[in-house]
Amino acid sequence: ALPISPDLTKEQRNGIIEGARAICSKVNYTGAGTVEFIVSEDGTISFLEVNTRVQVEHPVTEAVTGVDIIAEQLRIAAGEPISFTEDPHSTGHAFEFRINAEDILNGFAPCPGTIVSFEPPTGPGIRVDSAVRSGSIIPPYYDSLIAKLIVWGPTRDVALRRAKHALREFRIDGV
């Protein structure tokens, strides 16, 4: 799955927001979490699941809302109120690409080793979340995720152009 912020109608977006609110209200949930819905090709929205933790895809939501979800989660855990009082508005379109150390010619098997060179892309609407750098070792024991590339644009087309450019610019050698 490619985490994206889909183009939704106002009615679809409001339905998702109200559905998520109703679920959280019913169980008196306070904190950061994820209420997931799936949108079919015909526009039908279906509830998928609830997670009482932040998902790996949270930067997509951060990109389109401007809300630092992790900072808000820490505020709530510290007993502080969230930093905003109105619902965040979604703007633009965002994609998240998971950059993994995998062997595409061997069924995407993990590809451990030492990262010789790590050169992430930069530019408007480009965010890279990673804890590796040149010289980092990717062990065979854990998830092969190296980085998450999050790309935002004011429109889907701009976001796609930026994503294509960023993926061409991303350089990782050694694994």
Predicted segments, located by residue:
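ATP-dependent carboxylate activation and anion-phosphoryl transfer catalytic cores
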Residues: 1-175
